[in-house]
Amino acid sequence: MHAYQQQFIEMAIASQALKFGEFTLKSGRVSPYFFNAGMLHMGSNIAHLGRAYAQALVDSGHPVDMIFGPAYKGIPLAAATAIALADHHNRDLPYAYNRKEAKDHGEGGTLVGAPLTGKVAIVDDVITAGTAIREVLALLEQAKAEPAAIVIGLNRKERGQGSLSAIDELQQSTGVPVVSIIDLDHIMMYLEKAGDQQTSEKIALYREQYGSD
């Protein structure tokens, strides 16, 4: 586990974005952990997120020409990632995002920021069903831009109704690689290193039941 991944977990726990206990998910499953990126709402959090997303993207090796953030949670992530790439990686890339409702005045339309062109990295917090990402892929196709990678905060590595996770299904159906800052393996490694064997074992049992790998 890289230092930025451990720091991401530490920040998420300190901000209560990552919690351990018993949480009933929308699926009805009772999970031993819960991740809510909406809790990362401080200026220091968004700066940290930008650095982590930028590092994950750079480490992935996928060449990109611009950053795109799907409305709404992806909007600050796109800006923060673009800032971190410029400040820490000497890569000054344009960014854009979409609105959920089109404007009929001012600049109009659903797209804001730089024109969609070249190889585009899409940044979002998590992928649940993949619906929002598919909408973005359609926008890129219309603009004749190429999706280079999708970067998310956490990959739960959890299957849906079938044997695949939403991320696996998305990668298989679109061919677009998904990069995550952390996944379930990193959380378990962090807990074991911290000496919290009990929580790590609960997550391992949950993964045995619902894991996608």
From Swiss-Prot:
One Pfam family linked to the record: Pribosyltran
Source taxonomy: Bacteria, Pseudomonadati, Pseudomonadota, Gammaproteobacteria, Cellvibrionales
InterPro entries, A to Z: OPRT (IPR023031), Or_phspho_trans_dom (IPR004467), PRibTrfase_dom (IPR000836), PRTase-like (IPR029057)
PANTHER family: OROTATE PHOSPHORIBOSYLTRANSFERASE 1-RELATED (PTHR46683:SF1)
Residues in the signal sequence: none
GO biological process, one term: 'de novo' pyrimidine nucleobase biosynthetic process
Disulfide partners: none
Binding, orotate: F34, F35, T128, R156
UniProt protein name: Orotate phosphoribosyltransferase
Keyword hit for Transferase: yes
Species the sequence originates in: Teredinibacter turnerae (strain ATCC 39867 / T7901)
